[in-house]
Amino acid sequence: MNAPTTVADSVTVPVSLGDRSYDILIGKGLVERAGEEVAKRLKGVRVAIVTDENVAAVHLERLQASFARAGIDSTPVIVAPGEKSKSFATLETVTNAILAAKLERGDAVVALGGGVVGDLSGFVAGIVRRGMNFVQMPTSLLAQVDSSVGGKTGINTAHGKNLVGVFNQPQLVLADTQVLDTLSPREFRAGYAEVAKYGLIDRPDFFAWLEANWQEVFSGGAARTKAIAESCRSKAAVVARDERETGDRALLNLGHTFGHALESATGYDSSRLVHGEGVAIGMALAYRFSARMNLAGIEAAERVEAHLKAVGLPVSLAEVPGGLPPAEKLMDYIAQDKKVTRGTLTFILTHGIGQSFIAKDVPPAAVLEFLKERLAIA
């Protein structure tokens, strides 16, 4: 596993993918340093900065000034905030804006925003002129520790989440920890679900550290930077082994099969459920289901739920506002999960804290019965 290195006020985590390797820089002040860092790696480029209205209001001017200082011309492309921008309509709008600006294949798309902007921008960068350069500047905790690393990009459809997209690795990730101070408490908590996930997959020591230090992670400082760097380190190691999710990269989907089904069931309405909240409930359900299938003790599920509750995350179906459809409908959404192979269900289940594994051919009847039980409790 690649160890983070500290250089100048930032931590660097390498992602090792041969000639497509890149660095994740983590630290304060990276928005101001962005022009300098991009100019080092991509000579003579112009950039399209894809961002949403909320992020643009707070960070766009500083980023454009940084690019201007480095002699880089930038064109902003601003989209509506929220999951609904991961759509064919917005994809077309952003693509047309980049083409209208006459950006060339050797130029770059810079994603300044959370996971939605990153996923959308990466897809655009992968298909416009058959592939432009791509730089991730994640502004949410969730994006800094998860979606900005590893090259997964895409949009949603009426059939489910992330069903259309490409693998497109960035040339650079700049994770400015200072921008996290502008997040709402709810947004920060949602991102923390993905941080906890890395401990639950295969790093019980990291999960125990989070249990002891989560309050400092939330308040900022060294613990926050460490949590982000360790999360990126975990993901970078998995991506280096299995870039295209043909093997154990699927472990990173712990909690996501249930979570994506809940997001679909709530119509991607962020007032009801955001991605990280869906993942938190999904991880709690994965641990409960593992216990129900006699794969793990109930104590592990209770420990996971206790920690997620402590930080203010939901852990049950009852906590989804506005109610949920019947278990049969949730199963329809689960059947659209990208881990489904030839009609059989694949889940990330667990033998305990830090002992997750890929479970293939999970009996649909067992999942349906489990969902009925959890909905009845709701």
From Swiss-Prot:
GO terms for biological process, alphabetical: amino acid biosynthetic process; aromatic amino acid family biosynthetic process; chorismate biosynthetic process
Catalytic activity: 7-phospho-2-dehydro-3-deoxy-D-arabino-heptonate = 3-dehydroquinate + phosphate
Gene3D superfamilies, alphabetized: 3.40.50.1970, Dehydroquinate synthase-like - alpha domain
Annotated EC: 4.2.3.4
UniProt keyword list: Amino-acid biosynthesis, Aromatic amino acid biosynthesis, Cobalt, Cytoplasm, Lyase, Metal-binding, NAD, Nucleotide-binding, Zinc
Main location: cytoplasm
Cofactor annotation comment: Binds 1 divalent metal cation per subunit. Can use either Co(2+) or Zn(2+).
UniProt keyword Cell division, yes or no: no
Pfam families: DHQ_synthase, DHQS_C
Entry coiled-coil feature ranges: none
Gene Ontology terms for molecular function: 3-dehydroquinate synthase activity; metal ion binding; nucleotide binding
Biological or metabolic pathway of the protein: Metabolic intermediate biosynthesis; chorismate biosynthesis; chorismate from D-erythrose 4-phosphate and phosphoenolpyruvate: step 2/7
Cellular component terms per the entry's GO annotation: cytoplasm
Localisation: Cytoplasm
Binding site for NAD(+): G115, V116, V117, G118, D119, T139, S140, K152, K161
Cofactors named for this entry: Co(2+); Zn(2+); NAD(+)
EC main group: lyase
Domain of life, per lineage: Bacteria
Residues annotated to bind Zn(2+): E194, H256, H275
NCBIfam families (alphabetical): aroB
Family per record: Belongs to the sugar phosphate cyclases superfamily. Dehydroquinate synthase family.
Its biological purpose: Catalyzes the conversion of 3-deoxy-D-arabino-heptulosonate 7-phosphate (DAHP) to dehydroquinate (DHQ).
Protein name: 3-dehydroquinate synthase
Organism encoding this protein: Brucella canis (strain ATCC 23365 / NCTC 10854 / RM-666)
